[in-house]
Amino acid sequence: MRAKLWRWRWKILLGLVLAYLLTIFVLADWLVLTPIPGHVNAGKARRETLTVNGCALECWVCKSAALVDGTPQGYVLEFCGNATRAESIAEYVGDRWKNYPVETWVVNYPGVGGSAGWPRMSNIPPAALGAYDALAARAPDKPIFVEANSLGTTAALCVAARRDVAGCVLHDPLPLKQFILDHYGWWNLWLIAAPVAWRVPSELDSLQNAAHTSAPCVFIIAENDDFVLPKYHEQVIHAYAGEHRSLILHNKGHWDGVGPDTEQELQTDLAWLWANAKQK
């Protein structure tokens, strides 16, 4: 009887260990990225693929309203946030830049949408840098702005710290590793948070990347962000080396966009960014 009880205890312990290892090595990326499967309507956006490290990286492209002659005078490279597909925001991004003759390219990470590969955090840095390089090769003399929201700002800053981007638009940026440890560690005694944070690539260290970015930047900050608390946004802003402005979305949360009440202020900030774009 006692031997049978011990066997059951060992089976339970083994099951817990396997579940823990599954969380660390398999589910960690899913917990952070939460990729959305299936078809997503992209509206009027057109699909393009960039070849990055021999694999197809899917982008959804829109022309701004100001782009009337078909020749873009600049490009915007947008990286999606958590649980977001490029198809869902492509038209929104294009409309944001309506006053500038640009094309906006919104990237689906590897393993998301029509992009090849696996949805892993380790695949984001090479994909983000490869997307910039592929776009720059198409238009070597045109400025490229990087833009992102939330999780996507880690990819945008990864690129901005390593390439000659013209400028950045960062909505609710976060230092991902610190956020995971601080915000999620306490309730699981860091048994889950620490391994998940450990899997965040060093190339996605937003504080280090911000300190090595000289391009001008517009920060968009939700005043009442209760998901990624404003103190995390402030860490990135404080670390940012380049000239920057901050647009505060009053009474807005993490999932809120720029509304009519702040649209004019955003356009003023984009005009400043366009006028002060870093030259290659």
Give names to the regions the model predicted.
Residues 158-209, 259:
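Hydrolase active-site cap/lid region
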Residues 92, 205-206, 215, 229-238:
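Short alpha-helix in the alpha/beta-hydrolase fold that links the catalytic acid
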Residues 223-228, 255-256:
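Acidic catalytic loop of the alpha/beta-hydrolase fold
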Residues 212-214, 218-225:
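Short beta-strand/loop motif that positions the catalytic acidic residue
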Residues 57-134, 147, 154:
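Membrane-embedded segments
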Residues 234, 238-280:
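C-terminal catalytic histidine-bearing segment of alpha/beta-hydrolase fold enzymes
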Residues 139-150:
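Alpha/beta-hydrolase fold nucleophile elbow
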Residues 9-51, 58-60, 64:
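An N-terminal hydrophobic leader/cap segment in hydrolases
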